């Protein structure tokens, strides 16, 4: 088992090496819109998981997730060689690439919050003209309404 601080430093270094290699050294056009978001290394330093996102060419374009995954799988050996040369560790970790869904989750959360805000605004608009049903204090009883059966009874409320 390695020191957790060492594993974090190695993960950060691996992420930087992989991101740099994808941007400057690997000439696959499917990797032009790939961004490395996070890297995790196991405690034994033998396996590294690289999280990535894929953006579309424009805001309205759908990203090519399958193409990016295939390109990363194809370039896995070259990237591992670059990581081995750049880190200088005894055993170069195997690389696993995982699509990071954090951006999609955040976008979905924002949509849910927007819908909730709209529902709250509609409810506040309805509440503006609303009045309470019934009397101001429906549980208040007047002395004249008190039943006569209690006059001689010990159960009479005080």
From Swiss-Prot:
UniProtKB keywords: Cytoplasm, Ribosome biogenesis
UniProt keyword annotation of Oxidoreductase present: no
Q: Name one GO biological process term.
A: maturation of SSU-rRNA
Q: Which domain of life is it from?
A: Bacteria
Task: Please list which residues make up the signal peptide.
Answer: none
From the Swiss-Prot or TrEMBL record, state where the protein is found. Cytoplasm
Q: Which InterPro entries match?
A: KH_dom-like_a/b, RbfA, RbfA_dom_sf, Ribosome-bd_factorA_CS
* Segments of this protein annotated with the region Disordered: 127-158
Q: Which Gene3D superfamilies match?
A: 3.30.300.20
GO cellular component, alphabetical, reads: cytosol
Q: Example GO molecular function term? A: ribosomal small subunit binding
Q: Basic and acidic residues bias located where?
A: 134-143
The family database entries (PANTHER family) matched by this protein are listed as:
RIBOSOME-BINDING FACTOR A, CHLOROPLASTIC-RELATED
NCBIfam families listed in its UniProt record: rbfA
Homology family: Belongs to the RbfA family.
* Self-association state and partner proteins as the record states: Monomer. Binds 30S ribosomal subunits, but not 50S ribosomal subunits or 70S ribosomes.
Known function: One of several proteins that assist in the late maturation steps of the functional core of the 30S ribosomal subunit. Associates with free 30S ribosomal subunits (but not with 30S subunits that are part of 70S ribosomes or polysomes). Required for efficient processing of 16S rRNA. May interact with the 5'-terminal helix region of 16S rRNA.
What name does the UniProt record give this protein? Ribosome-binding factor A
Q: What organism is listed for this UniProt entry?
A: Mycobacteroides abscessus (strain ATCC 19977 / DSM 44196 / CCUG 20993 / CIP 104536 / JCM 13569 / NCTC 13031 / TMC 1543 / L948)
Q: Which gene encodes it?
A: rbfA
């Amino acid at each position: 088992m390695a020191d957790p601080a060492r594993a974090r430093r190695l993960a950060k270094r691996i992420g930087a090496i992989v991101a740099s290699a994808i941007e400057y050294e690997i000439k696959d056009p499917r990797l032009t819109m790939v961004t490395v978001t996070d890297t995790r290394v196991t405690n034994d330093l033998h396996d590294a998981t690289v999280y990535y996102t894929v953006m579309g060419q424009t805001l309205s374009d759908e990203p090519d997730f399958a193409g990016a995954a295939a390109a990363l799988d194809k370039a896995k050996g070259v990237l591992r060689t670059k990581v081995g040369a750049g880190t200088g560790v005894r055993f170069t970790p195997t690389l696993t690439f995982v699509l990071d869904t954090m951006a999609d989750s955040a976008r979905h959360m924002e949509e849910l919050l927007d819908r909730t805000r709209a529902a709250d605004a509609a409810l506040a608009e309805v509440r503006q003209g609303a009045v309470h049903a019934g009397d101001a204090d429906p549980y208040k009883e007047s002395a004249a309404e008190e039943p006569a059966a209690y006059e001689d009874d010990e159960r009479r409320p005080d």
